[in-house]
Amino acid sequence: VGDEAQSKRGILTLKYPIEHGIITNWDDMEKIWYHTFYNELRIAPEESPTMLTEAPLNPKANREKMTQIMFEAFNLPATYVTIQAVLSLYASGRTTGLVCDSGDGVSHMVPVYEGFALPHAILRLDLAGRDLTNYLMKIMTERGYSFTTTAEREIVRDIKEKLCYIALDFENEMNVSAASSSIDKSYELPDGQVITIGNERFRCPEALFQPSFLGMESVGVHETVHSSIMRCDIDIRKDLFANIVVSGGTTMYPGIADRLQKEITALAPATIKIKIIAPPERKYSVWIGGSILASLSTFQTMWITKEEYDESGPGIVHRKCF
């Protein structure tokens, strides 16, 4: 589990219990939580209230099962389930804005007004980090490098995280890279072999803006952000356009803020001010927002306690966690 599995990946097959933000393998997930409580945090779960986060528009059963495991397997005194994007906004010191959160399994656009997510305008895009890693594996194969095993996928993920960037103008960048080798970078594989990566550096994350690269029919993140804002009340759109906060690991590419600014400016009315906020710590802003929320004195009445769970069962999570 965790880093130990990574360090032995050469002889193991790596599996992920979460797909597109939804837990698909509960036994494995329980092992990860066990590892987190006992080996990483080194705390006694039965003494530690724990906040969990999830993607918006997740199946209700997912929440209930999560709550059930926390109370029945780990005997927590209290728990709370909250939506990731809202926490990212808190971490940026805002209560109103549109959050574009993109992690490993799912991306979502969540408009928040005065601290409340607007459920009718939340849009979800099942295109995120893992899809980009798979796509990079595919286009690296076209270059003649073979990456197929789960261990090799982790190498490609590392290449993606270290070398990929988002082009401001994709066509222009393609022309530049065809004419010169200025964007070529080399990467040393664990076995010492050095490989070269060229236009794959920006072709890979370009799929966020052009999902057709992955054979998907959905529109890109910029259009999804715009659609989400347009689903909101006309009076608050101006505030949302001026507070677009990006968060999650898949927003860490250099160039993402400038590109979003350019694309959304092209979609929005000319008079509207558009501001993209991309805090440097955005990979962890959900966690930061969670620690802010959990430490507020006003939040202490919000926890679902073990007593409440024993009385009402897992369904209580829908009543107490908005």
UniProtKB/Swiss-Prot annotation:
Its EC number is 3.6.4.-. One of its GO terms (cellular component) is cytoplasm. The keyword Hydrolase applies. It catalyses: ATP + H2O = ADP + phosphate + H(+). It holds the Pfam family Actin. SUPFAM superfamilies: Actin-like ATPase domain. The keyword Transport does not apply. It is found in: Cytoplasm, Cytoskeleton. Its main location: cytoplasm. Belongs to the actin family. This is Actin. It comes from Procambarus clarkii.
